[in-house]
UniProtKB/Swiss-Prot annotation:
Residues 46-194 form the Tyrosine-protein phosphatase domain. GO terms for molecular function: MAP kinase phosphatase activity; protein serine/threonine phosphatase activity; protein tyrosine phosphatase activity; protein tyrosine/serine/threonine phosphatase activity. The lineage of its organism: Eukaryota, Metazoa, Chordata, Craniata, Vertebrata. This is Dual specificity phosphatase 29. Substrate binds at H138, C139, V140, M141, G142, R143, S144, R145. It comes from Takifugu rubripes.
């Protein structure tokens, strides 16, 4: 990989082409923000299905256990666990149901490192869907923290680019991850593109005649 790509990837406002043979370019953070304001979006509602088996919702959705039952929710990922500007549920809140709970104490602030939860959240969602079951990923409004974790899951588990993941979800739910979260999703996109390029290079090397 060229040193030019590495230096560009450190600038969150620059577009980066990781694979020189690909037409795909990871946008800068400001360009990612523009995706949420381009074209018609969907109206805000309490909960939406954004992928088979995956629902993004808000605090109201998470608190209404009968409603979760009606949706067939078997797993709840609370991306806003904690006391301040968060949703106070926890595993005990669902103890009289068959719901499996996973909580993440994430602050909806641009400076918060939500990327530390990308892999454990994706693993929880993956395990829920492998049954197959339905999982609710929520925060207070269901627009930033929960949306960010679902976008990361789609990128890691389904090989969607950050652009394709955003476009897919925003057509089904009104989402708006904060600026810092978009930076981290952009960094994830570059990391995943680099890993795929490395794998492709290794495969091509193995296929060359000796």
């Amino acid at each position: 990989m060229s040193s030019v790509v590495k230096s560009k990837s450190k600038n969150p406002y620059a577009a980066v082409r990781v694979d020189p043979d690909s037409d795909y370019i990871t946008p800068g953070t400001l360009d990612l923000e523009q995706l949420f304001w381009s074209g018609p979006g969907v109206q805000y509602t309490h909960v939406n299905q954004v992928w088979p088996g995956i629902y993004i919702g808000d605090e109201k959705t998470a608190l209404e256990r009968p409603g979760l039952r009606d949706l067939g929710i078997t797993h709840v990922l609370n991306a806003a666990e904690g006391k301040w500007n968060n949703v106070l549920t926890g595993a005990d809140y669902y103890s009289d149901t068959n719901i499996q709970y996973y909580g993440i104490e994430a602050d909806d602030k641009p400076t918060f490192n939500i990327s530390q939860f990308f892999h454990p959240a994706a693993q929880f969602i993956h395990e829920a869907l492998s049954q197959p079951h339905n999982v609710l990923v929520h925060c207070v409004m269901g627009r930033s923290r929960s949306a960010t974790l679902v976008l990361a899951y789609l990128m890691m588990e389904h090989s969607l680019s950050v652009v394709d993941a955003i476009e897919h979800v925003r057509q089904r739910r009104c989402i708006l991850p904060n600026h810092g979260f978009l930076k981290q999703l952009r960094a994830l996109d570059i990391t995943l593109q680099e890993a795929r390029l490395k794998q492709k290079t290794q495969t091509q090397g193995q296929e060359k005649p000796r």
